[in-house]
């Protein structure tokens, strides 16, 4: 895990032997499972360390507390939620993943990593956000899902408690995308707090973290029915 260790050193973070072992296990299980179902196109050891593990942990630049109640929306193979859980074991983590095969991987890898305080939720975000067990219950919501910011705002902010935050990693020039998302962010009860540049070893490709803050309750009609936020963003 030399690439990951080096990248984390730029953040002033060091891993203990247990955490290093967990990341090694995560890599091995990811590659093994990926041979059976498509979890990721990134499988080389160095690339996984940088583009999955370090990229996930880079969210600490936006300010993450060790006792967050965190929901990772569209978690896929567990990024960024599981690397953050390894780094901060006291986090109460929810992994929201609608695809059953990916959710099964998340359940299995959580056990193999010896993690507690992790809930796998295999449902659509639009449906889950209307469930009072999950609606406005999280201090932090993350999503690395490839989606327009207007769509992401509708799929993430309803999970945030007032005073909570959304961290959404993005790449490239996002000024126009953020302008389009302004209506959705406001309607969900949020505001754009800041955009943070990510400059870490191996991640010098224009990565940014969009930080949204929840300032008021999300109206009951949001999010809209499954599929609509992606097909018809609120712009």
From Swiss-Prot:
InterPro entries, per database record: rRNA_ssu_MeTfrase_G, SAM-dependent_MTases_sf
Entry's localization field: Cytoplasm
HAMAP family on file: 16SrRNA_methyltr_G
Function description: Specifically methylates the N7 position of a guanine in 16S rRNA.
EC numbers: 2.1.1.-
S-adenosyl-L-methionine keyword on record: yes
Similarity comment: Belongs to the methyltransferase superfamily. RNA methyltransferase RsmG family.
Binding site for S-adenosyl-L-methionine: 74, 79, 97-99, 125-126, 144
Coiled coil: none
CC per GO annotation: cytosol
Keywords: Cytoplasm, Methyltransferase, rRNA processing, S-adenosyl-L-methionine, Transferase
Gene this chain is encoded by: rsmG
Native species: Dehalococcoides mccartyi (strain CBDB1)
Protein name, UniProt field: Ribosomal RNA small subunit methyltransferase G
Keyword Transport: no
EC top class named in words: transferase
GO molecular function: rRNA (guanine-N7-)-methyltransferase activity
């Amino acid at each position: 895990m030399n690439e990951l260790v080096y990248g984390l050193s730029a953040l002033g973070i060091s891993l203990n032997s247990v955490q290093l072992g967990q990341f090694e296990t995560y890599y091995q299980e990811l590659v093994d499972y990926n041979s059976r179902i498509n979890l990721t196109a990134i499988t080389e050891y160095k690339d996984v360390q940088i583009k999955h593990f370090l990229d996930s942990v880079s969210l600490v630049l936006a300010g993450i507390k060790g006792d967050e109640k965190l929901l990772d929306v569209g978690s896929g193979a567990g990024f960024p939620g599981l690397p953050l859980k390894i780094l901060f074991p006291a986090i109460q983590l929810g992994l929201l993943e609608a695809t059953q095969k990916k959710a099964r991987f998340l359940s299995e890898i959580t056990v193999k990593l010896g993690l507690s305080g992790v809930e796998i939720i295999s449902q659509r975000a639009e449906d889950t956000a209307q469930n009072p067990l999950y609606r406005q219950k999280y201090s932090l919501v993350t999503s690395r899902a490839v989606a327009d910011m207007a769509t992401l705002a509708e799929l993430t902010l309803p999970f945030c408690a007032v005073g909570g935050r959304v961290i959404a990693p993005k790449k490239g020039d996002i000024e126009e995308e953020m302008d389009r998302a302004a209506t959705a962010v406001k309607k969900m009860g949020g505001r754009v707090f800041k955009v943070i540049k990510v400059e870490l070893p191996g991640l010098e490709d224009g990565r940014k973290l969009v930080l949204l803050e929840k300032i008021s309750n999300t109206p009951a009609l949001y999010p809209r029915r499954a599929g609509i936020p992606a097909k018809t963003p609120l712009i």
